Amino acid sequence: MLSFHFWKSRGQPTDAASSVADGIQTPRCCRRCQANNWTGQLSYRTLATVSAGAAAPQPQTTSTASSRSLPTSLRLAAAPPQGLKNWEVVAAVAAVPTALGPVQIRGTLLRATLQPLRGQRRTQDFPSDHHCLFLSLKPGQGLIMEAAPPELNSKARQAEVGDGVSSAQDSQELKQQLWPLPKPSASSQREAKYVDMCASAEVQRESPQTMKLTLGHCPGGQRASRSPKEKAQDEPSSKTPSPQNNPASSQLSRSQHSASEEGGNFSSSSSSSPMNKAEEDGLSKMEDSTTSTGALATSSSSLGFESESGESEGCQAVGGEGEKISGGGGGGKGGGGGGAGDGTECRDIIAKSQGSRDPPKVEEAHYITTHEIQLSEVEQDMDFDVGLASRWDFEDNNVIYSFVDYASFGGSDETPGDITSLTEEDDDNSCYLSTTPSTNTTRTPSPTSSDLARPNAGRSGRDTSSTEVGSGPSDSGPTPPPTGPGTAPLTEPLPETPEAASGAAAAAASSCGSAASQILLSIKPASRAINEPSNVRAKQNIIYAAKHEGDMSLRVSTAAEHNSSSLKQNPAAAVAQDHAKKFIAVPARLQTRCGAIRAKELVDYSSGASSAVSELDDADKEVRNLTSRAFRSLAYPYFEALNISSRESSTTLSEVGFGRWSTFLDLKCGGVGARVEQSLLRSSAASVAAGLRKGSGARATADQLYIQSKKSQTKALEFVVSKVEGEIKHVETPLCFQKQVQTGSRVVTLLEPLNVRSESKASSAPGPGRATKGPGKGPGSAYTDDGSETSEGSKPTSRADGPQKSKFASSLLKNVISKKMQREHEFKMERGEVMDTSHHLSGTSKETEGARGSERQRERGLQRQSSRHSEAGSEYTVVSMSDAGGEGSVAGSKSPVFKASTPRERNAGPGRNFTDGHTEVCEIKKSASETVKGIFLRSQNSAFRSWKEKEAEKREEQAPIGKLKLPKGGDWRADLGEISASKNTIMSRLFVPNIQQTPKDKQPRKQATKYPAAQATSTAVIRPKAPEIKIRLGSVQQPSSDFNIAKLLTPKLAGGSASNLFKTIEDNSRAQQKLFRGDNLEKVPHFQVRDIRDKSKAQGPLHQVRDVRKLIKGSGDSSDKGSVTPEQGLTGPKPRQLSAAAGGSGSLSPMVITCQAVVNQREDSMDREPRESMGKGGGSRVLNSSSPEGTVLVHRASGRLPVATIAPNKPEQGSYLPVLKIVSKASTQKTPEKLKEEEVKEEGKATKPARNALEKLTAAVRSMEELYSFNRNEWKRKSDPLPMMMDSHVLSLIASEEREGVVVADGDHDKLSKRLGEVEERGTGNKAGVVLRGAPIERLQRRNSNPSAESVSARAAAFENLARERPRSLYIPPVHKDVERTQPLQPLPPLPSNRNVFTVSASSIQKTGGVAGKFPQGPSPESPSAAKGIKSQGLRSLKISPATRAPPDEVTNRKSGSNLEKSNSDCENYLTIPLKGSSAAGELLSRPGASREGPPNSSAATLCSLPPLSARSQVPSSSKGSQVSGTSRPAWRTKPDNPRETVAAPPGPQSPEHPPTTIYHQPPLPFTLQGAQPQVLCFSPPSMPAPAPAASAPVPTDPFQQAQPQQTQRKMLLDVTTGQYYLVDTPVQPMTRRLFDPETGQYVDVPMTSQQQAVAPMSISVPPLALSPGAYGPTYMIYPGFLPTVLPTNALQPTPIARAPRGSELSPMVAEPSSKEAAATFTEAPYFMASGQSPASSTSSAPAATSQLLGAKAFAQLHGKPVISITSQPLGPRIIAPPSFDGTTMSFVVEHR
């Protein structure tokens, strides 16, 4: 898949408009378009993925600087630039010719017209601005991407590109010639990648076949990005401006137009030839469908920019129809889940972010663009931008093939398959494989192109590619038949064609399958086996082999599978072809996802990646590394693809996404041993087919036979096959489990590759497939094939794939498995996990056996998962696949995943119809799993996962399906799996995390290695997944295991049962975050699927999910503890969560959407620390595990949730703890969050009433702050205040961020419920975007868990309040904890009122939860710790101060009596500004919150203030200082105010009711929270200082006092909830701000230069991020790495900048959370200025809050990385938020004035 990361470049010349990321030139100009957007558009489905493959000598335009310097044209030079090791090969490798031969035959020339969004510069797009990207896959050249000058259409452009355009080689040269991308800012470490776009320049301009990828996705602003054609198309949406292919242009135009109309953002339409045109037509149709289905998924997510994804995706899906456009296609996939709910917002965001063509026309001069540079987190290869993970230039040629794959994916698939892709948001495979073939084929056969369905049927042979791409149609559940190519799986008839195509393709290049294969081959030009492209099948085999060799190219396998599938059955064939496509995608995507996300993992598991790739070769470490990189590169794109698929409607996603995921997973598995896999593919295909039939009742024996015979061997291949079949199966699933599988199955299928994800999704019973259903079958298979298997079981077509696949896979599998085993063994030995091998192998068999039965269950669970799950699953699946399935997850993760899945599956439906199919699939999966295990989860997988999890899995199998009864390891695994199942889905959605996954990969891997399998696995898996978790519609998926929960969750979310939902979200969030964070694969499994599904089990795992990384290091048996705890927690607190979840099930999806991308990073850090704290601090305390569910969940899920997690982590955890609490409260989830502190206590706490929990929480906070210092990956018992501060402070900033994110998430949750999470994703993205978004509710639940600590009674009260308040559409004012918990529920119900439910919650949680809930519980224990330790985390401090100050008495008051007030406090904390409802735009809530903010109490006060926000109608005039007085919403505010005031007053430091000063934030930010409108409200109140101090100072008192100067500062405050930006002129009362100096751990009063601006509040609409702040900022919070650095710097320095004021104003809004945590304030501060925000707080908080609140100021990425003075408002673009780097993606927010 070509991942076009179009990094928005602003104001660059048109020539800069296109930027080639990863060797593909992408319009750099799209100022609006974030790299992610482009990635979404192009990258996801189109060329985008290729975009950041290798950095050209010049930094890619995609780099952060990109926005400023828009070297739009990043070309993959024929000679690889510095970073283009692989690309060069791609172009030059002979293998490419073989691989590309067919492609060339097709004349695959993908032309992407990049219309830079020059909205700032000019709204209209000018031809001169448009640049065409020609992506040619030439047999000899490989993928050539060249950008034509904007002047002419493709021809002129091509000419411009150079005469070489016509020739691929020339094109390459030309490309080099063509604008070498100026170095965007090196900030994105991305090497500028040159893409030879001109491989077939001539073809493109001449032959209709040439695909015209018009990536016109820069509507606002750089409209004229690069491609005149695009511009012409764009401008004359209706007319056919492009001379090259007028018909195509027409199509394009129409597509664009429709996109614009639908999304108001025409991403880019891809039409090159009549075929394209036809395709475009179909695409347009699809686009509409996509849009309606949720085209607006978080496309950014897939790139790893959750926020971007969200914004870009919706639009992209809408706009990315023809092109897959991949903001729409790719992005859509990522944001699929959220897109549907958020279409409007997405559009807006895209219009802003992506600058859709329409929006460009009506673009504001002032807009904010977020540029994300995805650096694939290959630890070793920093060159590669994960974000651009389109193609990694690895020394291995994998990158190249990867690139080619993407090129084919993005290119061919983009246009021909684009439609499908678009439709099938699940573009992962489609785009990849299908793209090229499709392009060629599709282009050739216009009819096919016309309609996906039509093409599918019409160009049977050719359409196979298209069919693969056609997955898109699958994606569009509604239009499966139309999605010809992609639909193949869906359409039974089509499969025949695909089969024919497969056969033909095998023989002929033009065949779809062939094309797909070839594309893949193209992708891995240097792949060894690619050389034999003569036979498509052979070629595919070669490709597959090559992939296994080191290319991740699974084309070969795909082809075999494809053909097999086709032969077997039409649907099967289609699926197979899809699979082939997927295979293509998998190499790049899966590798990237698996690899990039677990760059470390891969690096660590060189064997893993290598094993996948290099396995064929000897376990050559070098190759392994290269492979690892390739995997990452591929995986990353894969993630994008996953994201895309997720974006599709659940049904579509289920079908397509599932298969795709499967394919990817397969590819990944295949990657383990391509050749073996090919063999395996054949045998496995047959096997799987048999299994499917068996599942269907047709081939039970055969399936079993195959599986059993090739248990080890078949595993990888079968996994692949099952993947392919999974898709088919998924298509067929509706037959068997239409309703269940349809919605859920597909997700599962998608998860298939992710297996964890799939399992999770299914389960539903993803794990169960492993353990539950098929006690005797291969659990490994179940897990790996879980998603796929379920699908397979359901889909006979999948079965049909069996025979051919079998043959192919048989030998392949043998080789692969043998090699993989060998390599895995080697790897393990390297890692010192030699024992893994035996366990791995034996476990695999075990798993395989267990998985089969489970698989059925999982299938059932899958089916059970509704569309929501499916949708979420798809998206998340993507992540999961790469994380979990990658499928290291399948193998090593498989155990955990299976485990999690197993329980889920059992829950879902042990008696699945697809037992046989599942068995077969399980077998395959087992093989794949094993392979993957070796590949990815070597350490965790093999040793712990395989062994422990397998045991657990077995146990689970035995255990009742409904019961998540996993052994310790198994339990958390099961949890993970279940969470994976439920959260994996979410994970998929969270693509930003994908990018972030890489970093997680690194860490978790290590951690995993250190600890037992269960622990390590859960940690590792969860960690990567955590980021993914967001995507994880785990909440949605929760139902699999706990269908009730799914239902409950949705209602809760929507109906006010936030508890469960939150928990789920939390879980999801956490899981996703973890996944992203660390071992995606591993983490995915760890991803507590159970948490969501089975609250009781999930809980512990939740903790693990959140804390897992920490846990891994912290305690070897943390996992076990987690496992045990989860059950206990499930029993106790979890049930609450379940209840909440049950209530919010409907909203689950939204919750998922809330996945935050931001949290990824922050959470990575935060999670790591908190988790470590849990693991380390909790290593001793088993409860830590238990608590983790509460704590970790919050932490992980929300990134804020870590409040509880943070509890141990003084700074971060301290502040997070409260958040966690709230989450806990939301889910009544066991309050175990305190678990952090309460190792021993934890368990009791979870079970015990709130008091115990509270005590625990308090203890945890105290312990964390006093006893523990969390260093990066672990909690250290002794904490250096400074180091801890530093690290923890980063955490605290993160926590603050998360808290804000939580708050945002909460609000977002509302949104989510309201919009299914699309906004959630964005909104949550505001702050905790990543965490929150994916699992805001979950987080809330987690938080509630913490709050649970406050007390069950409090929780109950909160629930009551929730119920009461829910109608109000405000987060309930119930006690903070309850509020948080309630909020999720309530917010969900009052979706309209997206008010800062979460925001408040976060704040409140931190402050109130920590103070009231946490401290109150253990005021005495917490008091020192809370007050002191919390000081570390300003927020905590705030909370704690109140708690401390207000003894239990007050705490109690607040807690029990003040549930409301807590809520208030919560709200206030975040919003500090008691915003009147959204309507209170003009009202200046007397900043009760601000007032409150003043004192540490401020957090309480702030929270109170927020309640007004919640109340919406209440606009306390009086300063919060009077706490009660200012509260127009007397009840909440008064209540909270009183307690808060009590708290505020009690605290000496807080005592100063600077609230009055702070109160200045009177302007009730009229958050149109409900509206979630992008409005900027000006608040005059000088609450800013208070919040900052609140955030900064443990005792916000000083801050408030500081905030005495009445100079007004204008701040952009973002209502995370509504995503509205308020421009608040807060009097900078105190010129000084209290900033927290992370280095010293002290709060410093820094004189802040307050901008004196109109005091009168003004409401300004901030279109860009306002709508989906999540899309931007939320994606990345301050990254742990950045935080420390930034914090110290920011801590003092940024404060002067608007940041301080911002912090303050955010304080009212988000600052209060920041107040809770110094970070929180700063977090909010980032709104105004990412850098300006109070550095310490702002760093962490800023990223979250900033991202989320990226309002007019677009605090840019709420990354407070470098402090950038955002306050200054010079015209022109400026980086508002400091570049945030989550380890994978560097994102910076640019504000264009």
From Swiss-Prot:
InterPro entries: CEFIP, DUF4585
Pfam hit, one: DUF4585
Gly residues: compositionally biased ranges: 317-342
Modified residues (Omega-N-methylarginine): R1774
Coiled-coil intervals: none
UniProt keyword terms in alphabetical order: Methylation, Phosphoprotein
Bias (Basic and acidic residues): 227-237, 277-288, 829-839, 846-872, 1161-1174, 1231-1246
Region (Disordered): 156-189, 204-362, 407-505, 757-809, 829-917, 1090-1147, 1161-1187, 1229-1249, 1408-1465, 1482-1567
Name recorded for this polypeptide: Uncharacterized protein C4orf54
Organism this protein belongs to: Homo sapiens (Human)
Record lineage: Eukaryota, Metazoa, Chordata, Craniata, Vertebrata
